[in-house]
Amino acid sequence: MSKRESAKYKIDRRMGENIWGRPKSPVNRREYGPGQHGQRRKGKMSDFGTQLRAKQKLKGYYGELREKQFRATFDEANRRKGDTSENLISLLESRLDAIVYRAKFVPTVFASRQFINHGHVTVNGVRVNIGSYRCKAGDVIEVRQKSKQLVTVLEAVQLAERDVPDYIEVDHNKMVATYARVPSLSDVPYPVVMEPHLVVEFYSR
């Protein structure tokens, strides 16, 4: 198992949930966290603990984002008009690495970030190698010609465990996706319940 795979499953074990809906997730076989003390019975969680857990789960889902980066995203969501929790999800889903993952060009969000960093993706015809790059509605994301036959890409397209959401239009024959619209929380196909309102409460303490 690669370090990336190990880290990903460690997040699942820590959360006690299969947050990406992966068939090989260890929490499909056991219901306790990582480490020698993972089997201890958990008591009732405090409000702070519940809020912290919601933040960790959302950060983990998008590839274990660094706290500074996640907080900056929250701060921008908070500055925008409208519901902060909805704004937060919209900003996270507008990340290039999230869109490449949603389009099923890669098997995981971790692989998406690496794929982009290695220069395999263009946005509106221009190569972009920053996973956190923010896309706008109407942007066209394409796998570069020389990268379309990579085994990682070919296998990801065939994954039956997740579907492409309707806010992303994809042509897998051409390996092109259009970010059709910015989604709301109810549009996003999370395999587990995400609670961005608790993230808002956490940062509002």
UniProtKB/Swiss-Prot annotation:
It holds the Pfam family Ribosomal_S4. PROSITE patterns: RIBOSOMAL_S4, S4. SMART domains: Ribosomal_S4, S4. Keywords: Ribonucleoprotein, Ribosomal protein, RNA-binding, rRNA-binding. Residues 94-157 form the S4 RNA-binding domain. GO terms for molecular function: rRNA binding; structural constituent of ribosome. One of its GO terms (cellular component) is small ribosomal subunit. Residues 14-49 are annotated as: Disordered. The keyword Cell membrane does not apply. GO terms for biological process: ribosomal small subunit biogenesis; translation. Part of the 30S ribosomal subunit. Contacts protein S5. The interaction surface between S4 and S5 is involved in control of translational fidelity. One of the primary rRNA binding proteins, it binds directly to 16S rRNA where it nucleates assembly of the body of the 30S subunit. With S5 and S12 plays an important role in translational accuracy. Belongs to the universal ribosomal protein uS4 family. This is Small ribosomal subunit protein uS4. It comes from Agrobacterium fabrum (strain C58 / ATCC 33970).
